[in-house]
Amino acid sequence: MEADYSSWGSTVKTIISAMQKPNIWALFMHPPASTFFKGRVCLLGDAAHATTPHHGAGAGMCIEDGLILSSLLKEANSVDDLKRAFEVYDEVRRPRGLKNVVGSKEAGMLYDFELEGDDLDKIEKNFTTRLRWIWDEDLEAQVKKARTMYLQPTSNI
């Protein structure tokens, strides 16, 4: 860590030299999952799409997952229905969860001036638009879509 900050000012160097075990905290994300379920096990939230914290959307995504999954599970009356509910949940939720994983990583790179460099106008433009897809999601429409898919014959998935 000291080598990484060797060109910084004396204040930063003094702080780092006072640390007993200086290290850099690593941030991890889950590689894109090919599915959110297997058999009778279905994942949601961070178990399905663990991500870096830069969007601040992890808990919200988990709640959204729970909303969709619960709306499907209340229709299930058998083990076969459970599999169908998981298939539909996976198709509806996986793209959004994985988009958050990728987007959050990009946001971290943006915060560290790795995406737009130091062009503050480009950074500002990116910041003002990048989270709209999270904030403006129509969850009622997503529930309706999931239930419609669930009620269709299996061959349509």
PLM region spans:
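Conserved FAD/dinucleotide-binding core of flavoprotein oxidoreductases
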Residues: 1-24
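Charged C-terminal helix
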Residues: 2, 102-120
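Short secondary-structure junctions and interdomain/linker hinges
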Residues: 7-12, 96, 107, 114, ...
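Short linear interaction motif-like sites in intrinsically disordered regions of transcription factors
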Residues: 9, 26, 134-136
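Secondary-structure junction/capping motif
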Residues: 9, 52-55, 138
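Secondary-structure transition/capping residues
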Residues: 12, 16, 77-80, 100, ...
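Conserved mid-domain beta->alpha element of the FAD-binding
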Residues: 22-106
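C-terminal lid/capping helical subdomain adjacent to the catalytic/cofactor pocket in oxidative enzymes
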Residues: 47-50, 67-77, 87, 91-95, ...
